[in-house]
Amino acid sequence: MSKKFSSKNSQRYVVVHRPHDDPSFYDTDASAHVLVPVSNPNKTSPEADLRKKDVSSTKPKGRRAHVGEAALYGINFDDSEYDYTQHLKPIGLDPENSIFIASKGNEQKVEKKNIEDLFIEPKYRRDEIEKDDALPVFQRGMAKPEYLLHQQDTTDEIRGFKPDMNPALREVLEALEDEAYVVNDDVVVEDISKKTQLQGDNYGEEEKEDDIFAQLLGSGEAKDEDEFEDEFDEWDIDNVENFEDENYVKEMAQFDNIENLEDLENIDYQADVRRFQKDNSILEKHNSDDEFSNAGLDSVNPSEEEDVLGELPSIQDKSKTGKKKRKSRQKKGAMSDVSGFSMSSSAIARTETMTVLDDQYDQIINGYENYEEELEEDEEQNYQPFDMSAERSDFESMLDDFLDNYELESGGRKLAKKDKEIERLKEAADEVSKGKLSQRRNRERQEKKKLEKVTNTLSSLKF
């Protein structure tokens, strides 16, 4: 008879997949699952019993005396099972193997700033409003109309077109944008007659000019028209002959006492140039008026001929060729086409040293001009027209061979040899295509064929 089943002596198994490291994993005849024995969860193993005995033997019999003292030294770990204070030592006993770590104080937490506070004035911030128990200026991320009123340059009451505005207020607003109403604090408008009495004869020309502009800025009508006309007299064209003799005698005498280059540094020749240009502009202004005749300007010519300054060169005609323009510039030297003055200040009287330098410069320039003229003359003399009879006998055949075998590509920038296959493809494409380029190529081919027929017939004739 078989023994009865006993759960105490039974063995429990579970069905699991066969592991990959099993030698029978790749065997097709073996099953994919295996039985693995497991222990009874209700039955304790002898190893577990031994482990419990070891733990129970290590537990202290009494309660620790230092539980809770670690927190006094800044140690926030649970010291119910381990005494962390045994590693602490009094300060000064072993300075080589111990260090002092101070406990952390109560740090103030930094409040997070709101992005809205970066764009709001201090008096409109949230914390200030809460102190004053005022309403917030922002609601749901948008500014209220009360806050936007403070950001406007001009209030809505006077902004835009206001036909019913007070005329006095309108004039004030227009004056704020008009430069004519702007008061210049730097310019003091004073009566010129009172100032001349105080300062006397030492009143400078520059100060007079400032007072003139100050009076103009002050505006208003003139007190006495006759006095105003006498004070600001315009240029008199009738006295132009003797004006330079009366006013510039001392300045003209400076040019007679020049002996070396150092004397030229003390002469303000630029003032003469500015005065010369100013006189010409005044004369041109009077010439443009119809009341002045051309006969009245004849008296100006002698003074211009005796002037130290040279005449302004006439602007060249645009119809000149490039070579003629280049020659004219070389003859002028460093002088410009418009002003006639050079970088070497040719308006100054030339000394002996400067004259020698000018002569040497002219000789060098003339040498270059003669060289260019000789080259042009040689080209004109040695020029011979093309003569086909003087060329070699096979020259024509060489040209024909070159034109038949080579062509220009890339828009005429590249010379390449003709390809018969490409020409054949082009002809086939031109026959099918209806574009303008294809039609033009077809016409050129037809004309070429006609020309070849004519040449063949002429070559076959015997004379």
Swiss-Prot record:
Membrane-spanning segments: none
Compositional bias of kind Basic residues: 321-332
PTM section of the record: Phosphorylated, leading to its dissociation from the 40S pre-40S ribosome.
Compositional bias ranges of the Basic and acidic residues kind: 46-56, 444-453
Residues carrying Phosphoserine: S288, S293, S299, S303
Cited InterPro entries: Ltv1 (IPR007307)
Keyword Cytoplasm: yes
GO terms (BP aspect): ATP export; cellular response to oxidative stress; endocytic recycling; maturation of SSU-rRNA; protein transport; response to osmotic stress; ribosomal small subunit biogenesis; ribosomal small subunit export from nucleus
Residue ranges, compositional bias (Polar residues): 454-463
Cell compartment(s), UniProt: Nucleus; Cytoplasm
GO cellular component: cytoplasm; cytosol; late endosome; late endosome membrane; nucleolus; nucleus; preribosome, small subunit precursor; Ragulator complex
Coiled-coil residues: 355-462
Residues with N-acetylserine modification: S2
Motif Nuclear export signal: where in chain: 168-179
A Pfam family the protein falls into: LTV
PANTHER family: LOW-TEMPERATURE VIABILITY PROTEIN LTV1-RELATED, PROTEIN LTV1 HOMOLOG
Miscellaneous comment in the UniProt entry for this protein: Present with 589 molecules/cell in log phase SD medium.
Similarity section: Belongs to the LTV1 family.
Protein name per its UniProtKB record: Protein LTV1
